[in-house]
Amino acid sequence: MIVSFGDATTRTSEVQLVRCTQGLNLWKLHQVHAVYKRVVHDTLGADEGNALLDQILADTNLYPPWMCVLLYAFCSAMVTPYAFGGDWVNLAISFFMGLCVGSLQFILSQKSYMYSNVFEISASIVVSFCGRAFGSIPRSHICFGAVTQGSLALILPGYIILCGALELQSRSLVAGAVRMFYAIIYSLFLGFGITLGSALFGWMYHNATNEISCPQLISPWFRFLFVPAFTISISLLNQAHISQLPVMVFISCTGYVVTYWAGKHFANSTEFTAALAAFVIGVLGNLYSRIWKGLAVSAMLPAIFVQVPSGIASQNSLLSGLQSANTIVNANETITTSTSDPSSSMSFGMTMIQVCVGISVGLFASSLFVYPFGKKKTGLFSL
């Protein structure tokens, strides 16, 4: 974390680099915002506020690691049908594979610092290998693309790219450039892991599946069930309190409705669809902050997490590594896929940037729409 302290009298600034583990805790974020408002409005002293912040940092998380593993698996199961076109069988397989990835992230990575450095690559290798193995079972109706993307949806660097795009748009060039570059390399790691896992199974079983698209077997009306369920589970996974869930679910579902119908009319414009949905999400979140005095950023984040898998699914860019794996295993065989640039995993990173740039533009436009002159009494706690 890079913190800059400016001095208006001398026109100088001091930059401090704070080393801390990256994470998101929506309930503690709400508590910190409440302390901030009390200090700004002189209902609480600075020393007492500092003591409360230390107490908030020392408090344990609302949900233990084993519950986070179950929530991760449930998130993977819920995102598979509405974002990646999986059916009920793929939903069950995604839950099982989500358990494996969640165990690697919340249990093994927390115990081993060395493994945490290679978690993303190892998880993508395991998921792509197992997903292609399940998809190659004859007459199983298991879709390799759906179960693989659903299991990896929660470790996509969408939040990192979004923060980088927002910082670049607000002229924070150093922090934004660092985040964007890190997210691109992170995307390449995921693409390499998918390629390696798919190629390993292709070497072992020459009749491995090459299908990445799935027939839509579940009625679109079930999205009214899957999207709220995914929103609730990913909010709890990010340590949200139950009292925060109603507004999160409402904003998330409204944003997804905009994404769904905008995607019908702008099928080849992922960033424009993301910008429209982000604008609606930002307007609702900022109105929640302005009228009901809530915390906009915590109410909007789960809705943004819903948008990222939808944008990735529109181009199947996460599975661009499958074509590379087929090229490695079957050097003389030509296989056609639906990806826009299947020979390179860079297409995945570019799709992530397109989606997140669209989201950042929509969020800035929504803040300008609700707060055209900014907030005078306190800071704007929004995205």
UniProtKB/Swiss-Prot annotation:
Coiled coil spans: none
Main localization (coarse): membrane
Species name: Saccharomyces cerevisiae (strain ATCC 204508 / S288c)
Gene Ontology MF terms: transmembrane transporter activity
Top-rank taxon: Eukaryota
Protein name, per record: Pheromone-regulated membrane protein 10
InterPro entries: ThrE-like_N, ThrE/Ser_Exporter, ThrE_2
Similarity field: Belongs to the ThrE exporter (TC 2.A.79) family.
